Amino acid sequence: MDKPKVNSLGSGQNNGALIYLVDDEPMLLELASAILAPLGYRIETFRAAKAALRAFKAAEAPPTLIITDYEMDAMTGLDLMEACRQIQPRQKFLLVSGTVGPDIFSAGPVRPVRFLAKPYQSKQLIDLVEAVLAD
């Protein structure tokens, strides 16, 4: 009998968790999706924080994790976190940015579970996603 295939970069213990990917750069959405989808995560991508917020509000159940860029048009990743946490206070987030560092959170009440600086390696993303989901 064949054993199930598990990607050597991840544990494979994600049970099809739903992840929202939010970034205004389509190539980065495709990259993150290509890294996470083969591990069994269900992925929904959004090119704007407002679109992700609309989907979040309309969803029957919230995503397990929202991975969002910080700097986007009209609404930042921190704005998205704050709006989602008003609805679902325990919503898990991973903030990704190439323009700010983790010190951005000291200025406000909203904190993601983790921060990942761009550019990142596949293993860094996988490890952080697994760590956030394990919390």
Language model features with spans:
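Non-catalytic signal-transmission and effector/linker regions of two-component phosphorelay proteins
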Residues: 1-20, 30-33, 54-57, 61-62, ...
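Conserved acidic carboxylate
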Residues: 23
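Two-component/phosphorelay signaling modules centered on CheY-like receiver
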Residues: 26-44, 132
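Acidic catalytic/metal-coordinating carboxylates
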Residues: 47-51, 76-79
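Receiver (REC) domain active-site loop signature in two-component systems and cognate sites
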Residues: 72
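Hydrophobic/aromatic residues positioned on beta-strands within the core alpha/beta folds
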Residues: 96-98
